[in-house]
Design a protein with these regions (language model features):
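Active-site-adjacent structural elements in enzyme catalytic cores
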Residues: 1-287
Length: 287
C-alpha cells in the first residue's frame, strides 16, 4: 500500500510541474498532462508527434469535478450513472469560463471527457487539483500501448515517469459519443453500443466519419502496426504473419492467435499486443 501511494505521489509531482506521465487505464495506457496548462498539453503533442488539430480526451475523477468545465445534460447523467467510470467518452459543451487549455480542444467550444475505471489512475485523479488530458501513450498513428513495456518501446526515456498498473484489461480505446445534440457515435470502442442504446432507449446516429473532428480517433490513419495487411486470407504466404481470432493446431511459427476460444473480448484485449509482437518478431506483412 505504501509503495502504491509513493508511486502516485511521484506521478503527481511530475504532473504538478507540467511534465507528462504515462498512466494505466482499463482501455489502454495514456500519456497524461495537466489539462489546464498550455505548456503541459503542448508537450503531449510534441512527444506523440500528434497534429494540433487532433483534440484530446480529458479525464476526470467524477461528474462533480466535471461541472467546473462542462454543461451537464440529461443524456450524460443517464449514461454516467450506468457506465462511468468505464470505457466511454462523452463530447460535451465547454463552459466559457473553463480553464481547459485551448490546445486540448483545438479552440473548439466542445470537449471530449471520460471517467476512467482503473483504480490506480482514479486514485491519482482524486489527489489532483485539475483534470488530465491523456491520449493513448504511443507515437501518433502507431499501435496503442497496453502495458508499461509498450510505453518504453514507444518513448524510451522521453517520458518522466510511467505509473505501472499492469496490463490494460480491455485493451482497446473507449467508445466515443457526441452528446452535443442527438446522441451519435463518433468512435467504436470498449463499450458495446447496444448497451448504450438500451439506456438511452433510442438508436444512436452513426457519425464515425465526421469531418468536424470533435474527438480523437477520427483521422484516416490510426492505431496502425505500420505493416501491410491482407484480409480474409485462408492460407498465408511464407513471409506473412498469420493473424487468427481462434487458436488452431499448428507448429508453424508465423501463426498468431487473439483468442483460445474465439472470444471477442479476449481478442480485443490481445489485438494491440499481438500486432506489436508480430512487428517485433520481424514480419513485414500480415494476413
Amino acid at each position: 500500500m505504501k509503495s502504491i501511494q509513493s508511486n502516485i505521489k511521484k506521478a503527481k509531482k511530475y504532473l504538478d510541474n507540467n511534465h507528462c506521465v504515462a498512466v494505466p487505464t482499463e482501455t489502454v495506457y495514456g500519456l497524461a498532462a495537466n489539462a489546464y496548462s498550455n505548456s503541459a498539453v503542448k508537450k503531449i503533442f510534441s512527444l506523440k508527434k500528434r497534429p494540433l488539430n487532433n483534440p484530446l480526451i480529458v479525464h476526470y475523477y467524477d461528474i462533480q469535478r466535471l461541472k467546473e468545465d462542462c454543461d451537464i445534460n440529461d443524456n450524460l447523467v443517464k449514461l454516467y450513472k450506468k457506465f462511468s467510470p468505464g470505457p466511454i467518452t462523452y463530447v460535451l459543451k465547454l463552459k466559457n469560463n473553463s480553464k481547459i487549455s485551448k490546445f486540448v480542444t483545438n479552440n473548439k467550444k466542445s470537449i471530449a471527457v471520460r471517467f476512467p475505471k482503473h483504480k490506480l489512475f482514479r486514485n491519482l485523479l482524486k489527489n489532483l487539483d485539475y483534470p488530465v488530458a491523456a491520449p493513448s501513450a504511443n507515437i501518433s498513428s502507431r499501435l496503442s500501448s497496453v502495458k508499461p513495456s509498450d510505453v518504453k518501446e514507444e518513448f524510451g526515456s522521453k517520458i518522466k515517469y510511467i505509473l505501472n498498473g499492469g496490463k490494460s484489461k480491455i485493451g482497446v480505446e473507449s467508445t466515443i459519443l457526441n452528446l452535443l445534440e442527438k446522441p451519435s457515435l463518433l468512435r467504436y470502442g470498449g463499450l458495446d453500443t447496444k448497451k448504450i442504446e438500451n439506456v438511452l432507449k433510442k438508436k444512436l446516429l452513426i457519425n464515425t466519419n465526421s469531418k468536424k473532428k470533435l474527438s480523437p480517433g477520427l483521422f484516416p490513419l490510426h492505431y496502425s502496426p505500420g505493416i501491410p495487411l491482407r484480409v480474409n486470407v485462408k492460407k498465408p504466404k511464407k513471409d506473412e504473419a498469420y493473424l487468427l481470432i481462434k487458436k488452431r493446431k499448428s507448429k508453424l511459427k508465423n501463426y498468431y492467435y487473439l483468442s483460445k476460444m474465439k472470444n471477442i473480448d479476449e481478442a480485443a484485449k490481445n489485438l494491440y499486443s499481438t500486432l506489436r509482437k508480430i512487428k517485433n518478431d520481424g514480419f513485414k506483412k500480415i494476413a
